[in-house]
């Protein structure tokens, strides 16, 4: 689940990812991953449309966590982290980033980065970096940007 901060919290990017798994012997949910301050987005009921984060289960059992800015400024983007359960931990298996510049139609790009293998495709070109296993608790978006060959 995605958890918004308390209403008086002024942090810009303080939406957390918390994943619970059902206990095998009881009807209880156990915390499997806690990653506070991982997702950027609007959290207020009267927040800005186009900045809402989301989380959903995928058919293969992975989770997709999406954040976006499709509302303000010329730089519009959507980012999806694909989380997979590996060796009793939730890791970032994939990173997808789509960017567009509203004032420069040729200034956009998209990138799909398989974090586990290090293979990426950006703008139709194949890229390769070293594969990594990164728990969601340790993930920083800069890792995805580097894998996509984007300099910060």
Residue ranges and their predicted role:
Residues 29-36, 93-97:
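Beta-propeller fold detector
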Residues 10-33, 83-85:
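Beta-propeller blade repeat segments, especially FG-GAP/WD-type strand-to-loop junctions
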Residues 36-53, 77:
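Repeat-based blade/solenoid architectures
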Residues 55-152:
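Acidic, small-residue rich beta-repeat scaffolds with periodic aromatic anchors
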Residues 2-5, 11, 44-49:
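A domain-level signal for the mature, folded cores of soluble proteins
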